[in-house]
UniProtKB/Swiss-Prot annotation:
Changing G409S: In allele Mad-10; pupal lethal. Coiled coil: none annotated. It comes from Drosophila melanogaster (Fruit fly). Required for the function of decapentaplegic. May play an important role in mediating Dpp signaling. Involved in the BMP signaling pathway. The modification Phosphoserine is found at S25, S453, S455. Its main location: cytoplasm. GO terms for molecular function: co-SMAD binding; DNA-binding transcription activator activity, RNA polymerase II-specific; DNA-binding transcription factor activity, RNA polymerase II-specific; DNA-binding transcription repressor activity, RNA polymerase II-specific; I-SMAD binding; metal ion binding; RNA polymerase II cis-regulatory region sequence-specific DNA binding; RNA polymerase II transcription regulatory region sequence-specific DNA binding. GO terms for biological process: anatomical structure morphogenesis; BMP signaling pathway; cell differentiation; compound eye morphogenesis; follicle cell of egg chamber development; germ-line stem cell division; germ-line stem cell population maintenance; heart development. Zn(2+) binds at C78, C123, C135, H140. The gene is Mad. This is Protein mothers against dpp. Residues 229-238 have a biased composition (Polar residues). Belongs to the dwarfin/SMAD family. Residues 192-212 have a biased composition (Low complexity). Residues 221-225 are annotated as: Interaction with lack.
Length: 455
C-alpha cells in the first residue's frame, strides 16, 4: 500500500471518528427544523442540544415544545427549565438569558435584548417573574414594538409673555462638582437618592419641586393643536375647518431614524484618541480588546495608540476588559456593564427620569444594566420646550450627549471633578434626537438671544 492510500484511509477514519463525536440527536435535528435565520448554525445547534438535555428529564416537555413550534397559532403550555443563580444560560462561551436565546433561535434572529420581549398573559413562568422555573416557549412572548413618536408642532408665529420666553434651567447654577449615585439590579441606593433628589424633579415629582431646572416644562401648556384631541370635537362638521386653520399656524416636524443611531468618540483625559465610531448596529460593545475581524458591532479601544499616554491611563486601559454593551431598542438606549470594573455614566435624560440633578454621574457596577435614554420622554420635553423659545429647545442638545468613563469615576465623591480628568472615557452622540432638534430649530428661526458657549 503506497503513502497516498495510507493518508487517505487515515483521513477517512478521522472523519468517521469526528462524525461520531459530533452526532446530533433526532430530537435536536427536529427542533432545528423550525430555526429562523441562516447565521450561527453551530451556536443554535449547541443551544438546542443543551435544551433537549434539560427537557428530557421532564415528561412531555419536548413534545409540548414541538407542538408550540409546529402550530404557532394554537395555545400551548409553558415549557420550563430551572432558573440558574444569575438567571443566565451559557452556550458555547456566550452567556444569555434563556428566553432570549430560544426566541432568537425560533422566532427573531435579530433579537438583541430581553427589553424587546414581553410575556403573554397566559404564561405562568415568565422570566420577569423570577420564579425557580423559566418558560422558554418562544410563543409565550411577544416582541415590543418601537413606539411611534408624535410630530413636534412648531408655531409659525411665536408669542411669549415677557420674562417667560426661555426655559428656566438655563439659569440653574451647576454644582461645583456633579453629584454621584450608585445603581444596582435592585435600583439606586437610598443614600444616593437622599443626596441628589434635592436638586431636580422627575417626570412624576417635577410639579412639586420648586427648585427643579425642568420646572418651567411642567407648567408649560400643550401646543395649540394636538391630533389626538381633534377627535373629541362635538361638531363633526367643524373638525376639518378647525384642523386647517390651526395647522396653518404650526409646522409639523416628525422624528426619523438616521442611518447611524449614534457615534462614539474615545478620550484619554482631555485628548481624543482614534476615529469616531459610527453605530449602525442596534447592539454595540465598547471593550478594551483589539478587533482583528473589524466587526461593525464592536468598538475596540485596545487597538488605539496615543504617544501622550501615561501609566495611569495604561493601567486603566488594562482594566476595561469586556467594557460596556450599548443597545438601542424600541426607542430606548441601555448600558450594560460587562467589565469587571464599574462604569460611570452622565446622562441628562436618565437623570431627568430619576429626579436627579442634570449633571449627576451614575455608577453602574459589573453585571448591571441601566436605561440611559428614552426617546418618548425626550419627545415630550421637546414638544413642551417649543413653547418656551429657541434657547429652551437648543438647551436640549445637552440631553443628546452621554458621557461614560471606565474604571475611574468623577464627581463630588471622587478626587476627579470633571470627566476630562478621568483616564479613559467615551462621549456618545445620539443622532436621531440631535437631527430632530436641528429640524425643529430650523423651523423656529433665529434665537432672541445670541447662543454662546456660556448661554
Amino acid at each position: 500500500m503506497d503513502t497516498d492510500d495510507v493518508e487517505s484511509n487515515t483521513s477517512s477514519a478521522m472523519s468517521t471518528l469526528g462524525s461520531l463525536f459530533s452526532f446530533t440527536s433526532p430530537a435536536v435535528k427536529k427542533l432545528l427544523g423550525w430555526k429562523q435565520g441562516d447565521e450561527e448554525e453551530k451556536w443554535a445547534e449547541k443551544a438546542v442540544d443543551s435544551l433537549v438535555k434539560k427537557l428530557k428529564k421532564r415528561k412531555g416537555a419536548i413534545e409540548e415544545l414541538e407542538r408550540a413550534l409546529s402550530c404557532p397559532g394554537q395555545p400551548s403550555k409553558c415549557v420550563t427549565i430551572p432558573r440558574s443563580l444569575d438567571g443566565r444560560l451559557q452556550v458555547s462561551h456566550r452567556k444569555g438569558l434563556p428566553h432570549v436565546i430560544y426566541c432568537r433561535v425560533w422566532r427573531w434572529p435579530d433579537l438583541q435584548s430581553h427589553h424587546e420581549l414581553k410575556p403573554l398573559e397566559l404564561c405562568q413562568y415568565p422570566f420577569s417573574a423570577k420564579q425557580k422555573e423559566v418558560c422558554i416557549n418562544p410563543y409565550h412572548y411577544k416582541r415590543v414594538e418601537s413606539p411611534v413618536l408624535p410630530p413636534v408642532l412648531v408655531p409659525r408665529h411665536s408669542e411669549f409673555a415677557p420674562g417667560h420666553s426661555m426655559l428656566q434651567f438655563n439659569h440653574v447654577a451647576e454644582p461645583s462638582m456633579p453629584h454621584n449615585v450608585s445603581y444596582s439590579n435592585s435600583g439606586f441606593n437610598s443614600h444616593s437618592l437622599s443626596t441628589s433628589n434635592t436638586s431636580v424633579g422627575s417626570p412624576s415629582s417635577v410639579n412639586s419641586n420648586p427648585n427643579s431646572p425642568y420646572d418651567s416644562l411642567a407648567g408649560t401648556p400643550p401646543p395649540a393643536y394636538s391630533p389626538s384631541e381633534d377627535g373629541n370635537s362635538n361638531n363633526p362638521n367643524d373638525g376639518g375647518q378647525l384642523l386647517d386653520a390651526q395647522m396653518g399656524d404650526v409646522a409639523q416636524v416628525s422624528y426619523s431614524e438616521p442611518a447611524f443611531w449614534a457615534s462614539i468618540a474615545y478620550y484619554e483625559l482631555n485628548c481624543r484618541v482614534g476615529e469616531v465610531f459610527h453605530c449602525n448596529n442596534n447592539s454595540v460593545i465598547v471593550d478594551g480588546f483589539t478587533n482583528p475581524s473589524n466587526n461593525s458591532d464592536r468598538c475596540c479601544l485596545g487597538q488605539l495608540s496615543n504617544v501622550n499616554r501615561n501609566s495611569t491611563i495604561e493601567n486603566t486601559r488594562r482594566h476595561i476588559g469586556k467594557g460596556v454593551h450599548l443597545y438601542y431598542v424600541t426607542g430606548e438606549v441601555y448600558a450594560e456593564c460587562l467589565s469587571d470594573s464599574a462604569i460611570f455614566v452622565q446622562s441628562r435624560n436618565c437623570n431627568y427620569h430619576h429626579g436627579f440633578h442634570p449633571s449627576t454621574v451614575c455608577k453602574i457596577p459589573p453585571g448591571c444594566s441601566l436605561k440611559i435614554f428614552n426617546n418618548q420622554e425626550f419627545a415630550q420635553l421637546l414638544s413642551q420646550s417649543v413653547n418656551n423659545g429657541f434657547e429652551a429647545v437648543y438647551e436640549l442638545t445637552k440631553m443628546c450627549t452621554i458621557r461614560m468613563s471606565f474604571v475611574k469615576g468623577w464627581g463630588a465623591e471622587y478626587h476627579r471633578q470633571d470627566v476630562t480628568s478621568t483616564p479613559c472615557w467615551i462621549e456618545i452622540h445620539l443622532h436621531g434626537p440631535l437631527q430632530w432638534l436641528d429640524k425643529v430649530l430650523t423651523q423656529m428661526g433665529s434665537p432672541h438671544n445670541a447662543i454662546s458657549s456660556v448661554s
